[in-house]
């Protein structure tokens, strides 16, 4: 029996709907259920072919469990190793290298020393910072936002250096980015599932939270724009290796700028995304999970330490060093 586990937190609608959908597909040899955990023994197999992770970003115990599960061949959506290492600033840089449009963005030193550090810990920092250069590169309006995290927490729109410093001085020890504010005519949030399926949703980030998904979901203003959004969304998720993600685009002068695309546990509650979007994402994730469960994939084989699990191996660098010592 191939088991698909769903690991979740405060969500009320998506997890049970996903389990019900998978089991309702009646695929021979496949069953979905909620993951139940106690103390986890090291190197113990999880018993799951696939785990859909909706909460480990908030619970370190769950993240450690998922890494242990991946070690034994469980396919975890999304990859807990990359998710742990990822951040939004790196994503912006990577996207730029991939040809995806990104507004000018700068990462900034912490406004206050992180806990356990002093000014002596910061001796590699320029002081004072060349703020004029930063503002000239980014421009105004701009958004000051954390280099990691989500949910629109600690995000501030600033229209001048004075507004910037007012908000920056309240960010404490958070690591922040400053990104040029796109004056968008259209805005879209896209579900990207299995690095293959894209569902474009008209979105209004300025509206109250429960009204942000535009009713009727009108399509992008042109076929060319729709094609570009789909292409860039897939490019980003394939490069990042995310099988369940949302990508947000702000469209200015016909150019879709990728604004936010590190959402490996994206909102999928029916009360916020609406019935049609909810039905689409439940169906797409269910089919992806079943396909992965039946695929025979072993993600552990792609990781750096996988070779060591197959038996004694020599690291190339160590091998070369040994030969050099012999010659000496």
Question: Positions of the model-derived regions?
Answer:
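A short, glycine/Asx- and small/polar-enriched loop/turn
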Residues: 44-48, 253-258
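Active-site nucleotide/adenylate-binding loops and adjacent lid/helix of ATP-dependent enzymes
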Residues: 2-8, 70-73, 81-187, 216-223, ...
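Short, solvent-exposed loop/turn segments at secondary-structure junctions
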Residues: 11-12, 57-58, 83, 149-150, ...
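A long amphipathic alpha-helix within ATP-dependent nucleotide-binding catalytic cores
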Residues: 209-257, 283-297, 301-319, 323-327
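Glycine-rich phosphate/pyrophosphate-binding beta-alpha loops
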Residues: 56-57, 262-278
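Generic enzyme active-site microenvironment
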Residues: 51, 77, 143, 246, ...
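Conserved N-proximal alpha/beta basic substrate-recognition cap immediately N-terminal to
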Residues: 9-121
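Phosphate-binding core of ATP-grasp and ATP-grasp-like enzymes
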Residues: 172-175, 181-215, 230-246, 250-257, ...
